[in-house]
């Protein structure tokens, strides 16, 4: 079987070129595109200012290529207008977008006006956000799950990210779906009693577990609706529900396997960061503790931590790398700029 990396870094992110390199680089564009929204940010390195633009979804799997590209360009235009600059003044632009076919987004952007832009999968942006674009691992667990890492010699590896039908183990969707399954097993006696049963009826406004099961096939729930139920799973786990806690332990084990695969295939050893990105980690210790234990079983010195900076920060860090000014702004200062800009919108 082919064992080449599923995701690699574009040459421009390993050998910076940029439109305007070095001291001439002032404006960098970063974009974070997902299944629900798109955020563009223009970073003014001279004035230490950030200008944002917002648009709808840009995940091609969710809305198609045409609408995805339109969202990216609409968000960009807003951010450029906020910065009072033209497109040609950008030193670099990095688009981190969710979906299975970022190459299609790349082609369509090149066919419009963005022939110099760098398009990567959102897991690459997440890795950069988590590690400061340095050797280490970024592990996403939001609605879906995905893990990506870069080793000290530049080797890359992705594990997971196969979508909710074939994967997304350890994600909010997985937790929500398995919580409903646990309620079904409680009802038919094939599983232990759990407070997830009553919680599922209230959350999905269903009169019975049987009706909930039937409705899934007649009016399928969206990924977001299923993933949202994981909040209830978290609440019940903290309240001591055994089944809810077991689900988080299973989620940690499955996601931990993917993280271990990334560590093994990138050659990461010793002290390196493993950044946890996504809404599922808001569950706290019921999820993060068993996941950390799973990681430390193979990498005892790894630093495991929840990432606080918004994902668009990773795109901006990669943009600075692309135009040869990596380190012009550290992660802490960038995170503060993003937090302030988001608070004003």
Where would I find each of the regions flagged by the language model?
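ATP-binding/phosphotransfer module of carbohydrate and carboxylate kinases, centering on a glycine-rich
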Residues: 1-89, 104, 129-135, 180-345
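Broad gene-expression machinery/nucleic-acid interaction feature
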Residues: 37, 92, 144
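Residues at the starts of beta-strands that form the adenosine-phosphate
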Residues: 92, 116, 273
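Phosphate-binding/catalytic loop of phosphoryl-transfer enzymes
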Residues: 96-194, 331, 342-345
């Amino acid at each position: 079987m082919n064992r080449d990396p599923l995701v690699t870094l574009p040459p421009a992110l390993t050998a910076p070129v940029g439109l305007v390199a070095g001291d001439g680089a002032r404006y960098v564009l970063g974009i974070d595109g997902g299944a629900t929204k798109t955020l563009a940010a223009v970073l003014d390195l001279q004035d230490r200012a950030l200008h944002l633009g917002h648009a709808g979804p840009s995940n091609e799997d969710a809305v198609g290529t045409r609408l995805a590209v339109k969202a990216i360009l609409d968000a960009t235009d807003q951010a450029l207008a906020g910065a009072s600059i033209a497109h040609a003044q950008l030193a670099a632009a990095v688009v981190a977008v969710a979906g299975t076919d970022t190459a299609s987004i790349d082609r369509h952007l090149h066919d419009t006006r963005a022939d110099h832009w760098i398009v990567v999968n959102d897991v690459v942006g997440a890795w950069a956000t988590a590690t400061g674009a340095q050797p280490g691992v970024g592990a996403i667990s939001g609605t879906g799950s995905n893990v990506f890492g870069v080793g000290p010699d530049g080797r890359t590896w992705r594990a997971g990210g196969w979508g909710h039908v074939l994967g997304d183990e350890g994600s909010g969707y997985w937790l929500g779906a398995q919580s409903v399954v646990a309620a079904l097993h409680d009802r038919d006696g094939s599983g232990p009693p759990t407070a997830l049963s009553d919680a599922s009826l209230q959350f999905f406004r269903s009169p019975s577990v049987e009706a909930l099961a039937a409705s899934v096939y007649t009016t399928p729930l969206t990924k977001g609706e299923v993933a949202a139920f994981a909040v209830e799973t978290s609440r019940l786990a903290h309240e001591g529900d055994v089944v809810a806690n077991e689900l988080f332990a299973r989620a940690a084990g499955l996601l931990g396997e993917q993280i271990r695969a990334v560590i093994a295939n990138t050659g990461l050893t010793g002290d390196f960061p493993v950044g946890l990105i996504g809404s599922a980690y808001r569950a706290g210790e019921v999820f993060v503790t068993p996941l950390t234990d799973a990681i430390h079983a193979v990498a005892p010195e790894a630093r495991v931590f929840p990432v606080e900076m918004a994902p668009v920060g990773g795109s901006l860090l990669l943009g600075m790398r692309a135009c040869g000014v990596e380190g012009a702004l550290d992660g802490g200062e960038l995170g503060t700029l993003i937090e302030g800009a988001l608070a004003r919108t």
